[in-house]
A protein has these predicted regions:
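Structured secondary-structure scaffolds
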Residues: 2-47, 95, 100-104, 155-375
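Short, charge-patterned binding micro-sites
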Residues: 49-55, 59
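A charged helix-plus-loop insertion that forms the helical arch/lid used to bind
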Residues: 59-74
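A broadly conserved sequence feature marking short terminus-proximal activation segments
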Residues: 70-139
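Hydrophobic faces of stable alpha-helices that mediate helix-helix packing
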Residues: 75-76, 176, 363-370, 391, ...
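Cys/His-rich short segments
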Residues: 115-176, 180
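Acidic, turn-prone loop/beta-hairpin segments
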Residues: 377-400
Length: 401
């Protein structure tokens, strides 16, 4: 059996309900998958939710519940209904709290530990709970307003925390040369070109080993390190593995071979380094192929800022689909925003395009077609005739497009 065309959305962090930025990514991946499917290819779309980590735990406690109940509620009431709301035809939905994922993560960890790619050490640094990531000084900016005088995360605009921990580390630094060679040998591995340039520049500066565990003395919402029950797995190391645990890693080699490596992994540019640096290094360490391509799309902006629930700039997809419908939602975000670049959303632009391009453009075409069928064929669409050479030539060109 030939390999299926495998597309993944990013594994979405489930500390809150989805906004249109998440839906934008889902639609883009769905459109790509459907395009390959209509060409007669077998295509597989994976999406899902990342449910571990300190941020989820803090959010749950802030809502007077436990993290499992909190994530169950969000997935059931918000994330799964989103797929139906915007007509996503995914073949699987994985949650990182599922046993199939947790067991496979521990297998992967044990494999890397046995191969001497993991060791125990100490680390001190600036930690952003929102990003679930240690930050370099260059990743921080001066705070404003209530955070004036403090250094804050450039993405979340909130102060980082100074942490000193003894954790387990993945030998990421050993993969610098292999990664650079992979980028050179596979020039379309990271797309668009601006994203590739950023990744290559980052790796050339030198890579530090990656802390991949957290002590249970801090918090315990995560997957146990298999050889040390006093530690849980770093949420990003856990989350990245969903792309293979969902398709049979450690349990169904035939399915894994059918789908992996992924053909396209679509991510937001703010998590590009995880997917274009850490993720391929993890796979190389395990003896697995990296994905064929990682595409980092731009941010969806509202009022010049990245879409964010915490900054009250998050717009629910239902706010749009309840008025304009799913088809208009999908059309607008694929037409109005250049994929790979930042794009601004406004209600005025959506309404204008809906009227000019859908109602007046496609709407008039449909109306005239129905009128002609009614006038010349008694309202019955005639059976198609045989394809002529010109028809076949047009179809051949379309298939190569």
């Amino acid at each position: 059996m030939s390999k299926s065309f495998y597309v993944t959305t990013p594994i979405f962090y489930v500390n809150d309900a989805p906004h249109i930025g998440h839906a934008y990514t889902e639609v883009a991946c769905d459109v790509l998958t459907r395009w390959h499917r209509q060409r007669g290819e077998d295509a597989f779309l994976l999406t899902g939710t990342d449910e571990h980590g300190e941020k989820v735990l803090r959010t749950a406690l802030g809502n007077h519940t436990d993290p499992r109940s909190w994530t169950d509620k969000l997935v059931t009431e918000s994330w799964l209904p989103l797929l139906e709301t915007i007509d996503i035809d995914n073949q699987d939905f994985i949650r990182t709290t599922e046993p199939r994922h947790e067991v496979a993560v521990q297998k992967f960890l044990q494999d890397l530990y046995d191969k001497d790619f993991i060791y125990q050490g100490s680390f001190e640094g600036n930690y952003c709970v929102g990003c679930e990531e240690y930050k370099n000084d260059g990743d921080l900016i001066d705070g404003q307003g209530e955070f004036d005088g403090q250094r804050v995360c450039a993405i979340h605009s909130k102060p980082v925390e100074q942490l000193n921990e003894t954790n387990y580390f993945f030998k990421l630094s050993e993969f610098q040369d292999r990664l650079l060679k992979h980028y050179e040998d596979n020039p379309t591995f990271v797309q668009p070109a601006s994203a590739k340039n950023e990744v290559v520049s980052f790796v050339k500066q030198g890579l530090s080993d990656l802390s991949i565990s957290r002590s249970k003395e801090r918090f315990d919402w995560g997957i146990d390190i298999p050889w040390d029950s006093d530690h849980i797995t770093y949420v990003w190391f856990d989350a990245l593995l969903n792309y293979i645990t969902a398709i049979g890693y450690g349990s169904d080699q035939e399915k894994l071979d059918l789908l992996w490596p992924a053909d396209v992994q679509v991510v937001g540019k703010d998590i590009l380094r995880f997917h274009a640096v850490i993720w391929p290094a993890m796979l190389m360490a395990a003896g697995l192929q990296p994905p064929k391509q990682v595409f980092g799309h731009g941010w969806l902006l509202v009022g010049g800022e990245k879409m964010s629930k915490s900054k009250l700039t998050g717009i629910s997809p239902n706010q749009i689909t309840d008025i304009f419908g799913s088809d208009a939602f999908r059309y607008y975000f694929m037409k109005a925003i250049g994929f790979g670049s930042d794009g601004s959303f406004s209600w005025e632009d959506l309404s204008a395009r809906y009227n000019a391009e859908l109602a007046n453009g496609f709407g008039n075409l449909a109306s005239r077609t129905v009128a002609m069928v009614t006038r010349y064929f008694d309202g019955i669409i005639p059976e198609p005739g045989e394809y002529l050479d010109a028809d076949n030539q047009v179809m051949a060109v379309a298939k190569k497009a």
